[in-house]
Amino acid sequence: MSFWTQKKVVVTGGRGFIGSHLVERLLEAGANVKVCDSTYSNGAMNDLATRDVEFHDRDLADPENCRKICRGADVVMHLAAKIRGVGYNVKHHGEMFFSNAVMNLNMMEAARVAGVSRFLCVSTVGVYPKDCRVPTPEEDGFKGEPEESGYGYGWAKRQAEVQARCYKSEYGMKIAIVRPYNVYGPRMDFNPETAPVVSSQIRKVLEAKDVLTVWGDGEQSRSFTYVSDEVIGMMLAVEKYPEADPLNIGTSEEIKIKDLVQLIVRLSGKNLQIVFDTSKPAGAARRCPDISKAKRLIGYEPEVRMEEGLQKTIDWYLEPAAVVR
């Protein structure tokens, strides 16, 4: 019998990109799922409308809402977060810190009071400083300051990790902490103002006529995690390592931005001239997680290679029924 069979699981942020995929995987594993979310991100839950999922629209800044949603739950998986684009983040560090810190504090405390058996704290790679080692081990998460572009958000997530450690120490609460790494796949954000690298480049390629302009020289490298690998990692962490100790959930497969763009162009069947604008910011030279800890402790092993994941994402974007913002 699966760990998840008949478990009553609350997923906050379950209408969103990663959350909706997690809900699907939990249902397949035999869990009874309750989704709490105040948004309808990308219509991500449309294809689950007929499934046996209980939906709640709740503001998690209200402690009483959090207590209500946690009552009777076996597991709480807290994915809800206020996330915006870099341009917004750099002007609203206080708002990003407060909004996320309040949700994290409320949900973990509500889960503790409800006596849930497991809690998932979803952190971020934004906890890492700009000068962290690459591949980046988990212990670098509290060295120096979070990157300036996501300073408020990064500190809110660091605070959540500290809260998890404190709750494990005093209350013996079983909490898993994961740090997702550049997740992509169907239902991700394609809004030009807020889209991350993969969806931004897919949209630009598919909408381009003859010339595609890419910021920077394209030499910077990143690793990207397909969403199905990410949610499996989250579930494994809850099941096997609820020790309030962070795990990188990503992939060690790196790709240069110029190669990523060329791959998207090839998969989309377009014939474009690619121009690199070196006057524009390109970000850090290299970003990649050390996932050896997750491999060792929970048996995590990413399975979807970049080309396969990109093709699935492009195919979804081109579907007439896809809801794209």
Where are these regions (language model features)?
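N-terminal Rossmann NAD(P)H-binding glycine-rich loop of SDR-like oxidoreductase domains
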Residues: V9-A29
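Conserved glycine-rich Rossmann-like NAD(P)H-binding loop of the short-chain dehydrogenase/reductase
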Residues: A31-Y40
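NAD(P)H-binding glycine-rich loop region in Rossmannoid oxidoreductase-like domains
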Residues: D57-S99, A110-V113, K130
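Conserved Rossmann-fold NAD(P)-dependent oxidoreductase catalytic core, especially the SDR/UDP-sugar
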Residues: H78, L105-G150
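NAD(P)-dependent short-chain dehydrogenase/reductase
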Residues: D131-D140, V162-E239, S252-E254, V261-L267
